[in-house]
């Protein structure tokens, strides 16, 4: 699977097209564009999408921003589809402030990815 970088950011941002699903059920929501963020520990999904899935609640957590600020958040479990792959039971944080999906290392470390900056494409090597 190949996806072109999003040029709405400068410099262009690596992104992937994903689907979301209730754990162990079909990937029913999507496709959505998700930011590939290799510096993020975890994956963040807008709370509205999590509520539409009625995703199972896992725990209340605290997150630290890149500026060192702490925020309270809620963690849920969802399945995430990338290309023909289904990544089951991924713990994600529900974001009440943004409509962006951020794929962190808890997802990215399960994929074989090529970030081809000169060509401005993200490739999932299956």
Indicate residue ranges for each PLM-predicted region:
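Pepsin/retropepsin-fold aspartyl endopeptidases
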Residues: 1-126
């Amino acid at each position: 699977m190949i996806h072109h970088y999003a040029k709405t950011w400068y410099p262009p941002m690596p992104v992937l097209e994903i689907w979301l699903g209730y754990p162990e059920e079909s990937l029913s929501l999507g496709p959505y564009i998700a930011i590939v963020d290799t510096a993020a520990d975890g994956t963040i999904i807008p709370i509205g999408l999590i509520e539409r899935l009625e995703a199972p609640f896992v725990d209340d957590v605290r997150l630290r921003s890149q500026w060192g600020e702490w925020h309270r958040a809620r963690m849920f479990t969802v399945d995430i589809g990338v290309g023909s792959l289904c990544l089951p039971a991924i713990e994600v944080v529900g974001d009440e402030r943004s409509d962006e999906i951020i794929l962190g290392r808890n997802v990215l470390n399960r994929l074989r990815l090529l970030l081809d900056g000169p060509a401005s494409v993200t490739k999932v090597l299956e």
